[in-house]
């Protein structure tokens, strides 16, 4: 999480390859807050990995709330929608976690505990 993934994780070929390999082998994938930025370039069968999947991540409203909308290279909510994700969100700053198959995403830092529990459930 944190804003860093918008610049590094989203563009790192090794991170992208790792997420794609996990997905292709059915392993659980978890991303909370800004970490869903890694789904910017990840693919599955030539399509965005999140296409048609229920996902969440830091909302445009939350980004506006921290006054970084005009600084970040892209908005997580907009990117997930543009990549065909079925974006869901809860109230700003409240815990909200979405699980779709092997993919667990959390909206913001308040979602960390619930996101970890959802990921552990997939590992059980």
Model-identified regions with their sequence ranges:
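Active-site-adjacent pocket-lining segments in enzyme domains
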Residues: 1-124
């Amino acid at each position: 999480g944190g804003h860093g993934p918008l610049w590094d994780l989203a563009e790192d070929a090794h991170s992208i390859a790792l997420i794609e390999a996990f997905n292709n082998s059915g392993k659980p994938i978890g991303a909370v807050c800004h970490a869903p930025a890694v789904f910017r370039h990840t693919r599955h069968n030539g399509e965005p990995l999140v296409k048609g999947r229920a996902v969440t991540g830091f909302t445009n409203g939350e980004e506006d709330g921290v006054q970084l909308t005009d600084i970040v290279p892209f908005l997580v909510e907009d990117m997930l929608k543009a990549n065909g994700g079925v974006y869901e969100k809860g109230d700003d700053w409240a815990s909200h976690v979405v699980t779709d198959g092997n993919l667990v995403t959390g909206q913001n830092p308040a979602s960390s505990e619930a996101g970890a529990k959802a990921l552990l459930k997939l590992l059980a």
